[in-house]
């Protein structure tokens, strides 16, 4: 069952990364340079996924097994 969810997770991550690359860096602090490091990109991806968890809730919600 987990193997069937893998393509969906990869698709969501791909869309999220593309969105992060297309969107400007939003911060309350003035940034002197654009963030290009892997660590920063990972943090931005995590922030995006946290803030958009309501949109992806239906994808990651467990199925109803009922008995």
Curated annotation (Swiss-Prot):
Propeptide residue range(s): 23-31
This protein's superkingdom?
Eukaryota
The record, for Gene3D superfamilies, names: 6.10.250.2190
Ordered alphabetically, the record's keywords are: Amyloid, Cleavage on pair of basic residues, Disulfide bond, Hormone, Secreted, Signal
Primary location class: secreted
Disulfide-linked positions: 35-40
Q: Name a single GO cellular component.
A: extracellular space
Q: Where is the signal peptide?
A: 1-22
Q: Which InterPro entries match?
A: Calcitonin-like, Calcitonin/adrenomedullin, Calcitonin_peptide-like, IAPP
Function field? Amylin/IAPP is a glucoregulatory peptide hormone that plays an important role in the regulation of energy homeostasis. Selectively inhibits insulin-stimulated glucose utilization and glycogen deposition in muscle, while not affecting adipocyte glucose metabolism. IAPP function is mediated by the CALCR-RAMPs (AMYRs) receptor complexes. Amylin can also bind CALCR receptor in the absence of RAMPs, although it is more selective for AMYRs.
Q: What is the name listed in the Swiss-Prot or TrEMBL entry for this protein?
A: Islet amyloid polypeptide
**Gene name in the database record:** IAPP
């Amino acid at each position: 069952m987990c193997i069937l969810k893998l393509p969906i997770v990869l698709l969501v991550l791909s869309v999220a990364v593309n969105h992060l690359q297309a969107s400007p860096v939003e911060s309350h602090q003035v940034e002197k340079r654009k963030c290009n490091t892997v660590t920063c990109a990972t943090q931005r991806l995590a922030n995006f996924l946290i803030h958009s968890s309501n949109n992806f809730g239906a994808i990651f919600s467990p199925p109803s097994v009922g008995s």
